[in-house]
Amino acid sequence: MMISAIDPRIKVASVSGALNLLQERMTLRHSCGSQIIPGLLKYGDYSEIGSLIAPRPCVWETGSTDPLIVPKWDEVFRDRLRKAYKALEASDQLHFDRFEGGHEWSGRVAYPLFDKVLKG
C-alpha cells in the first residue's frame, strides 16, 4: 500500500489483509505494534494513505476468518476509500474481495485485474 500510494509508476495495486486503521490498532491488546507509524494521526490514517492510490485500480482483499480484521473498523476504512475514489470519479477502479480464508493472500480478484491493466 505505501509504495503504491506515493509512486505514480505503479499502475495497479492489491492490498491484502490490511483494512485496519491506526486508531483501531492502538486500542487492541493483540496488536504487535509493527503497524504503528508515530504521528500519523496528525495527518490522517491508513485509509488516507490508501486513498492516495486513487484513481488507479486497486483491490483490497480480506479473508472471512482473518482475526486481525475488525468488522466495524474495516467498514470505516472501506467507506473512506469509497469517498476518495468517488471524489476522483474513479469508483469503478476500487475493488473489494472478501474471500474464504484467514490472514493470507488470495489474488482471485487481483490477478485478473493485474492482467487487464498491465497486459491490456
PLM features: what roles do these ranges have?
Residues 79-120:
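C-terminal catalytic histidine-bearing segment of alpha/beta-hydrolase fold enzymes
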Residues 21-22, 26-80:
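The feature captures the conserved acid-bearing segment of alpha/beta-hydrolase catalytic domains
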Residues 3, 8-21:
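A conserved short beta-strand
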Residues 11-12, 56-59, 95:
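Beta-sheet entry/capping signal
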Residues 7-8, 55, 89-91:
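Short, well-ordered coil/turn elements that cap or connect secondary structure elements
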Residues 1-2, 51:
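Alpha-helical segments flanking ligand/cofactor-binding loops in enzyme cores
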Residues 16-17, 61, 99:
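Alpha/beta-hydrolase-fold catalytic nucleophile elbow
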Residues 5-9, 76, 114:
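Short, solvent-exposed amphipathic alpha-helical segments in soluble enzyme
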